[in-house]
Amino acid sequence: MKANRFFMTAIFSIIGVLAAAQPWMMRPQGPANEFSAMEGSSVLNYNLQMERDIHSRAGYGPAFYIFPDSKLDNNQALELAGKLDLVNIIKEYGGRIMVVNPSSDKWQEQDLENFRRLIGMGGSPTNVKVIGIGSGATFVNRHLAATDLTGVIAGIVSIDGEPGKICKLPVPAFIGGKNAAKTAKPYQSTSDAAPADPLQKVVVNTDKKASLETLFAEAWDKVLSENYRYNNLYRTFYMSRGIDNPEGVKNFELVSIPVFEKLGIQRNVVEYPLVDMNAPSRPENPDKYLWYEYIPKQALDAAPGTIPLVVLFHGHGNDPRTQSESSGFIELAAEEGFMVVEMEWQGSNGYQPMGLDGIEAVISVIRQKYPQIDGSRIYAEGLSAGAMTSNMLGVRKSHLFAAVAGHSGGIFSGNGLGYYSYGSEPLMNEAIQKRGHVEVGFCSVVGTHDDTIRYLNKDNWEGNPYLNVWRIYETINGMPVTGDLDFNVDPTFGFALQDRTTIHTGKSEDITIEFGQLYKDEKPMIRLMVINNYGHWNFKPAARLIWDFFRHFSRDTETKELRYQ
């Protein structure tokens, strides 16, 4: 089983999605930073000149679809986008702006089908935001809200519209202006009947005199900025095309976007030159490392040696902000008070790959910069290839980390040639050498429907990357090593675990976590979690379960002995 095969499958799947999309979805079709008509439709598309840099956000940018009170031309669309501050939003987050004009003089059923087709083109939508104004809001309330598209849309804003009768599926919404209280009722009724979710909210402003700008600013602040949606149920979301899926999933998962100001998180962007910048012969453009620091307010002035550090690693080819913004650890840091650092470990866009020694060196720099960090409580977590990095670090840098976790990633079989030297043979050899001398807490998380690094079953368990890494950590921790699997013993794991339970996450009855642990001397050294029906990506509720595992482990900074409490 080779790393390249799995990752190239994912890459070619994404390429296939893009190739199948319409050309206007790929590149601006008019002057930069202006609106232009999309060929063969009444829709106007804002042609964003991409200017996002290392200081912007990871992505999941909103795709704004504006249903105006009356048909707008290009200049009117630009004026409206300016009023609502949409251009600045998509410059920070990425995304797009489209004005969905009616296809004739009045809104009609055909406009609904046009919209369905519009958001169904290209890859799976993740952050559809609908803005209805006046008659456009009436159309949204009476027609769009009555369809299953509400399970795909991440937020609806209705301003000065007439009310509809039903909202088919729960959708976050902001209702303002005329008729707001009455218009909100179908949205509220559907929301109230849904399982409790802080992201599933309906906010109402009944001030008839409030300006459009004021109402939308409130909508962005209280509803739209806080979430996005994807469908990672039964498949990996970025390998899907459009809004349709053979499994018939209607209600896409709502996921939080960390809003740093509200969380009390300070984010620092660090470019670190790999030469002495005071040397007279330094190069003009030296090689650099890149990382991101996330510091909760309670950690800013904390006493020396009191703040844990969680180091995150993104997946193969991902943006170096992806893991921090999509894993759930930033939200947890705000609650629990630990610091988070995400590293551009892989190297991209002119930044150097770190390697395992570089990662250790960066942590040393960060500890010198922030004396409040507790060197005995340093942890690592990653996604996919970042999970492999984290899994490697727990063995190769066992003196540094108290515990590590991998989400959607194990260790591939073989000698590691061809993929960052991540092979099970050399890592197992090191684990064997350290067995009886070194202990490391280890947590593994994977979805049963991971179609990039497939989870194990009765047909593929031999040499499976997840079983490889579980055995490696059993070995280094001096525990019995799992042999052949028997899915009659446990239909999920294939062997017996303690504390075995099924956790209901509140997200969906289809998304539950199979949970179990392996003990040594009454200490749970290995925590395994398998997410039923989930694809190859982060599942935010798992972050708390990982942190609850991490927090019990520390490593003596002098003797390097692992401690559990």
Residues covered by each model-derived region:
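Bacterial N-terminal signal peptides that target proteins for export
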Residues: 1-10
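Bacterial N-terminal signal peptides
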Residues: 9-17
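A domain-start/cap signature at the N-terminus of enzymes
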Residues: 21-63, 84, 92, 96, ...
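Short substrate-entry loop that stabilizes the transition state in hydrolases
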Residues: 56-61, 66-106, 299-353, 413-414, ...
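Loop/turn elements at helix/coil->beta-strand transitions in domains of secreted/extracellular proteins
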Residues: 59-64, 93-98, 124-129, 149-155, ...
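Alpha/beta-hydrolase
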Residues: 66-68, 159, 313, 407, ...
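Alpha/beta-hydrolase active-site loop
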Residues: 103-123, 130, 142, 350-372, ...
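The feature captures the conserved acid-bearing segment of alpha/beta-hydrolase catalytic domains
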Residues: 149-199, 403, 409-522, 536
